[in-house]
């Protein structure tokens, strides 16, 4: 078979990409999409894991798109070898939206894959515009980019409000952009009012009591981060834990099963109007937003299919905003690795009523988008490595600070 010679990298290209897929149709489409994108450079393609490994060792790509099911050496077998051959390379699994595809994808993420893109099943790839957008977006989000460090809220000394307009480039409080109105077929849901960020260093005092709810948001790199965090929890956690992880339907159910095996807590997909139990982990099902309501008996999960927020459903912002409303600040919000800025405005609202916000650090995040947005807005009470995040949450879950 003729080897694909790498094309010259354009000056503004941000990443060099290798595509490994045994399907000629899928491989052809993905290589064409990468070639057409000026931010990416296609350096090669391969038909199975063995050939892909040889090319990876030779070409040293920044990013690899790796199919799951292949002859000779499948994606799961090739994954650890590729990670060893090209340290620092980010691998995106290309998997189908099936139970088998979901199982393998979650396993791959736990083994070190950075993310996944859900491709249509065979015969439907010709019109796979959503797959194209998703794949290219994730490849560019995973491309190596230096991001300067930012201070945590704890590092910021109290200061009086400025008497003059802020200098150019100074942080500006942003209001929440309301989602578009729901379609006629979707149930009407309560809108959350925008909350401006209090002046830095002069916000509502932090609530250091045991949180009534622990809320976690994550996206790219989230499954592995969640696994590490949940594994750190003891069996006697007294707060319910609610999670919004950007994932499609079916995959979130499989994720819950894997998280249950990883630690001492029971993890499950949340059900509509399900009462939250202390020490249980509830994951927003794929394609549903999850918010929290409260009555005299306790807290309940509420699911809806109102339009995506921040291009996501489930989204982190509505979850955090609802937690802020029902707990009035007696809550802990955690923003883990992920691309974009989902969770920033929810963290702003939660913090404005006295809640505590933790963000994952840049060094251990697969993509420092979501936690970086929270940190850069001055909303993080603490920025922690993934290794420190679980113990940090547990400490605060017991009423520590």
Curated annotation (Swiss-Prot):
The active site is at 219, 246, 342. Phosphorylated by CheA. Phosphorylation of the N-terminal regulatory domain activates the methylesterase activity. It is an enzyme of class 3 (hydrolase). Residues 146-208 are annotated as: Disordered. Pfam families: CheB_methylest, Response_reg. The modification 4-aspartylphosphate is found at residue 67. It is found in: Cytoplasm. Residues 166-176, 185-199 have a biased composition (Low complexity). InterPro entries: CheB-like, CheB_C, CheY-like_superfamily, Sig_transdc_resp-reg_Me-estase, Sig_transdc_resp-reg_receiver. It catalyses: [protein]-L-glutamate 5-O-methyl ester + H2O = L-glutamyl-[protein] + methanol + H(+); L-glutaminyl-[protein] + H2O = L-glutamyl-[protein] + NH4(+). Keywords: Chemotaxis, Cytoplasm, Hydrolase, Phosphoprotein. Contains a C-terminal catalytic domain, and an N-terminal region which modulates catalytic activity. This is Protein-glutamate methylesterase/protein-glutamine glutaminase. The gene is cheB.
